A protein has these predicted regions:
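Conserved hydrophobic beta-strand positions in leucine-rich repeat
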Residues: 30-32, 42, 51-53, 64, ...
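A structural signal for leucine-rich repeat
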Residues: 44-46, 64-70, 88-92, 110-115, ...
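The feature captures the LRR N-terminal capping module
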Residues: 1-17, 99, 121-123, 140-147, ...
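N-terminal capping/linker segments that flank leucine-rich repeat
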Residues: 1-59, 71, 167-169
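Conserved hydrophobic position(s) of the canonical leucine-rich repeat
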Residues: 27, 39, 50, 61, ...
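Leucine-rich repeat
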Residues: 5-8, 37-42, 58-64, 81-86, ...
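Conserved, compact domain cores that house catalytic/ligand-binding motifs in diverse enzymes
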Residues: 44-83, 90-91, 101
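Conserved "Asn-ladder"/turn position within leucine-rich repeats
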Residues: 25, 35-37, 47, 58, ...
Length: 204
């Protein structure tokens, strides 16, 4: 390991598959990024001080459970996991920003209720359906280029004002629009839509 301002950096120089387990009650930031580094067992222990988590370019991790290890995290960035299939992010009551992108095998995610989340970016994954329920402060959503995505679950009269779903498989967005009265930005090109009624959303 090498010391840096504000933390410690570990560099894995040899090829191979690693088991990574981390416990650090005072740690505020984790950034595990690499050129498709192989981590077959990624386990994060109790980290009540964690504010920001970045995990990128990792292979051989098929499931990731972030339910209880970082109750005070505010930002999560998980991208370019070549083999990730299932992700759980629950019980993070201070989470504000979620970025889950470029995980081609990710078809299942348990998001739970997050009262402070304002922005959610989940593009270029493998979702066929997605729930946005239990996110009362959510304003901006990017679910673009989930090529199989054809349905959304939404709370009625939510506060979403920007929705990006280009490159998906929606045949209709009528139900989506009905639940989003505050919507003023919509991107929905590259779907299977045959009509688009925006008479109740004149600000778009």
């Amino acid at each position: 390991p090498t010391s840096m301002a504000g933390g410690v950096t570990y560099r894995y120089g040899n090829k191979g598959s690693y088991n990574v387990r981390i416990w650090a009650e005072e740690l505020q930031l984790i950034d595990i990024s690499g050129l498709l580094i192989s981590i077959s067992d990624l386990h994060l222990g109790n980290m009540p001080g964690m504010k920001s988590l970045v995990l990128n370019s990792i292979t051989d991790t098929r499931e990731l459970n972030l339910n209880t290890f970082c109750p005070n995290v505010e930002s999560i960035n998980i991208g370019s996991f070549a083999d990730l299939e299932h992700l759980e992010i629950e019980h993070c009551s201070r989470l504000r920003n979620i970025q889950i992108y470029s995980n081609p095998k990710l078809t299942s995610m348990e998001l739970g209720n997050h009262p402070e989340v304002e922005e959610l970016y989940c593009s270029y994954n493998g979702f066929s359906s997605f729930s946005l329920k239990g996110l009362p402060k959510l304003r901006s959503v990017d679910l673009g280029y989930n090529s199989a995505l054809a349905s959304l679950e939404l709370d009625e009269n939510n506060g979403i004002n920007a929705l990006l779903i280009s490159g998906c498989a929606f045949q209709s967005v009528d139900d989506v629009l009905e639940c989003c009265p505050s919507l003023n930005e919509l991107s929905c090109s590259g779907n299977r839509l045959t009509e688009l009624d925006l008479t109740k959303h004149l600000s778009i």
